[in-house]
């Protein structure tokens, strides 16, 4: 896919299900996935395979049933998450593993209890492990809009070097307004040395 093309990444079946009262059965998720496929969505994030048997089964069924777009499973930067995502995606025509780790100072200190070097190491290991299973690996630095920009650039460069093919810049807590977010994306495009090889 052309690097300059716009890719539609739909996370209704994963992030959307976190909305109050939005629980879906496996069959309902498949119906939605088939509709998304018919609409021409490029990537369907089908679920978080390690989180529950239901999510694993949904990702597996969607991976087997959807043929005209990529199917992704979310995974933390943890070996068991990566392995479970890969297992759920085994029958996918075009599988993607989407791995993420907290990157803001507040999340690193209070949620992860890790320093920046440890976060980079965890992210690189996760991307490297995911690449053993699939060609297409997406990486997200969670809470990116509150992350120190120099650290964010280093983290992105390291994960791209490890094999990430798509970089997602999430505004996890709704911290950034549109203009600020746009400026951050411009800065990332201008500063990340190896960004030209991947999608953002």
Where in this protein do the model-derived segments appear?
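N-terminal capping/small domains of soluble enzymes
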Residues: 1-78
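Short glycine-centered, acidic/aromatic-flanked micro-motifs in structured strand/loop junctions
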Residues: 15, 46-48, 141-143, 169-172
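Alpha/beta enzyme core
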Residues: 24-39, 64, 79-137, 144-194
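Conserved small/polar residues in nucleotide/adenosyl-binding loops
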Residues: 198-200
